[in-house]
């Protein structure tokens, strides 16, 4: 089983390594020109192919991230609640060459309209209790993304249920928006040039793994070692 998927796993590992090293993903060609071509004989097309056609379920990445996050919960906070937050974010893309690109409503669009041309990603975030400055705080780690498709309508029941959610939980919303902003601004989440839905989802989730490792999990592990 390992030998069957070893070449693909190796290629995806190199992609993750390049993202961690450069801390940016302008596009796969950028990763190849500035890092990958210097450490491997694999061709540029190999990395494009791995993203779009690899027989790898990236939900395994989400499971690993969740396991790492759960291990970071201190024993003294083992009885505290854990939260799963689901939200969506928009990514504007020009033209129609990307799979599943469509006109989307975005209340935060800054283009003079409430609509943008692009993709909608639904994300799930795990919020775990940790100690911070001798107080219980929640560390939010995005587990992964899935691209919303037109044939699957968005749930419209959320607004009716909002009044039942305690006000203090709104703080999680800030963590979600901060995560989106950081990934889009500093980790080039919006700059993917892969065209297929599967390829886009694979690359976006690889970026998310690196983001969690470098800015969330590592920082918390260092804090636990210090204190």
What are these regions (language model features)?
Residues 18-22, 170, 196, 200:
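Generic amphipathic alpha-helical segments used as scaffolds and interaction surfaces in large
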Residues 140-142, 170, 225-226:
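Short intrinsically disordered coil segments
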């Amino acid at each position: 089983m390992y030998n069957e998927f070893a070449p693909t796993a190796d290629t995806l590992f190199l992609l993750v390594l390049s993202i961690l090293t450069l801390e940016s993903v302008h596009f796969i060609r950028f990763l190849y020109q500035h890092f990958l071509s210097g450490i491997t004989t694999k061709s540029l097309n190999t990395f494009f192919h791995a993203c779009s056609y690899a027989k790898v379920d990236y939900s395994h990445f989400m499971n690993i991230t969740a396991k790492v996050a759960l291990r970071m919960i201190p024993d003294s906070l083992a009885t505290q609640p854990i939260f799963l937050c689901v939200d969506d974010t928009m990514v504007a893309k020009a033209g129609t060459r990307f799979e599943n690109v469509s006109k989307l409503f975005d209340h935060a669009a800054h283009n003079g309209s409430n609509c943008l041309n692009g993709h909608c990603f639904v994300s799930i975030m795990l919020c775990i209790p940790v100690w911070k400055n001798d107080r219980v705080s929640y560390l939010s780690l995005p587990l992964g993304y899935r691209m919303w498709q037109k044939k699957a309508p968005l749930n419209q029941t959320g607004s009716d249920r909002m009044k039942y959610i305690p006000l203090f939980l709104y703080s999680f919303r800030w963590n979600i928006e901060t995560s989106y902003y950081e990934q889009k601004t500093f980790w080039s989440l919006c700059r993917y040039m892969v065209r297929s839905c599967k390829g886009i989802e694979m690359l976006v989730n690889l970026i998310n793994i690196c983001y969690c490792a470098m800015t969330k999990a590592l920082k918390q592990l260092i804090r636990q070692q210090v204190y």
